[in-house]
Design a protein with these regions (language model features):
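Extracellular low-complexity, O-glycosylation-prone stalks/linkers
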Residues: 1-2, 6-17
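Conserved beta-strand positions that form and line the central face of beta-propeller blades
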Residues: 9, 28-30
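Cysteine-dependent hydrolase recognition
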Residues: 16-17, 30-32, 36-394
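Short beta-strand segments within Ig-like beta-sandwich modules, predominantly Fibronectin type-III
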Residues: 19-25
């Protein structure tokens, strides 16, 4: 068979049996066995020639679609803890109060905890665990606002730069795991160019390079520390973010429902760019996914989602953009995926990923290919936190 469909409901842990096998000339298939009001996720597997390297095993292309008919709106999403840098408890009191209202109106039961930027990560996590135990909701989310202590873990170099970037990387997933053991006993590495990535026993950075359990809490961070390429202060950047976040939630920031992909690694066997193509096609339809230049296009035309990848440094991706550009640009995209070397380690000063959301428009950015992300559920009402948790646990 050239193409096979499997199906699962949202809370299912495994795929069901293949529903149908189609030949290479088929362009559509209708599932007649569904119920209205239920969302179904479909995985499409396409048979491809064997890989040119390795053992020549069977090769598949895979894509996902989340679909349903007359899906009811979600009125109760769960509980959300906003973990806030105590520095801004008073100066951003209005914006924080408004954020809590926005979360409430979006179906969350919001709560807050204030922490000091110099607290130990395990101290912060203990507060999160106490909250989680008191709120045994089906869905729980963390919104990290400000300079919340950054956990580091592993001896990794997912950008491939083993000679100068292998070591501990930022790991907010630590805050999202309720179960599982995090150790600080075995990894010993000081080879990276930055001492931030050093990891030695007993230094407070963890050994784990994989999550020791499922990530149970949805997680997002808004952190503008050490972003001095911007003329605005950290407090001003946080206020601007909360202002545009509110504007988006109440419908004052309108974007065309389409996706842009600018892939400067088109010949990569890894398929860099696939997180853009696969997600955007599932969300908007392939006719609404455009292969265009990132900065030049988004400065003039709006795309709800965008993807850009190119040779990277801590503050840029070649032929995409840079943190310096983000200080003045108002690119017309709310959600963006960016991929390149170094900046996936987002705790660099003036980091490119954080530069995107520090800009005047963008609300969310992710390192777009390692791992591949799954955002298709957002087109049917799920949150970006859900997609993040799903991706972390995949």
């Amino acid at each position: 068979p050239e193409r096979a469909y499997t199906r699962a409901q949202l809370l299912d842990q495994v795929w069901g049996d293949s529903l149908v096998y189609l030949n290479s000339k088929s362009t559509s298939w209708t599932d007649t066995s569904i119920q209205q009001g239920i969302g179904y996720e479909y995985q499409v597997l396409k048979s491809l020639p064997a890989f040119p390297t390795g053992e020549g095993g069977q090769n598949f292309g895979a894509g996902n679609i989340y679909s349903g008919i007359k899906i009811p709106p979600t009125h109760h999403r769960g509980a959300c803890l906003v973990v806030i840098d105590r520095t801004y408890k008073n100066t951003l009191a209005f914006e924080i109060s408004r954020l809590l209202d926005d979360l409430l109106y979006d179906g969350w039961i919001p709560d807050t905890v204030f922490v000091d930027k110099n607290d130990a990560a395990d101290q912060v996590k203990n507060g999160i665990l106490d909250w989680a135990k008191k709120n045994p909701d089906t869905h729980q989310a963390l919104f990290l606002l400000g300079r919340i202590p950054v956990p580091y873990s592993g001896e990794i170099a997912p950008d491939g730069h083993n000679s100068d970037h292998r070591g501990a990387w930022p790991c907010d997933g630590y805050y999202g795991t309720i179960d599982g053991l995090w150790t600080d006993q075995t990894v010993k590495t000081t080879a990276a160019a930055s001492s931030r990535n050093d990891n030695i026993p007993g230094d407070g950075k963890f050994d784990n390079k994989f999550f020791p359990s499922k990530v149970q809490l949805q997680i997002g961070r808004v952190d503008f520390s050490n972003m001095n390429k911007f003329s605005e202060s950290e407090e001003q950047l946080l206020r601007r973010y909360l202002d545009k976040n509110h504007a988006w939630r109440i419908g004052k920031m309108q974007m065309m429902e389409q996706g842009l992909v600018d892939n400067n690694f088109p010949s990569s066997e890894e398929g860099l760019g696939q997180s853009g193509w696969k997600n955007f096609a599932a969300m908007f339809g392939i006719s609404n996914v455009k292969d265009l230049q990132y900065r030049q296009t988004l400065s003039k035309q709006s795309f709800l989602w965008s993807y850009g990848c190119g040779g990277g440094g801590p503050e840029s991706a070649s032929d995409i953009s840079s943190t310096t550009n983000f200080t003045t640009d108002s690119l017309l995209s709310i959600f963006t995926m960016l991929f390149g070397s170094y900046f996936g380690d987002w705790d660099y000063p003036n980091n490119f990923l954080r530069g995107a959301i520090a800009s005047k428009t963008c609300l969310a950015s992710t390192w777009g290919n390692r791992p591949n992300w799954f955002f298709q559920h957002m087109a049917l009402g799920e949150t970006i936190g859900y997609s993040t948790q799903l991706t972390m646990n995949n």
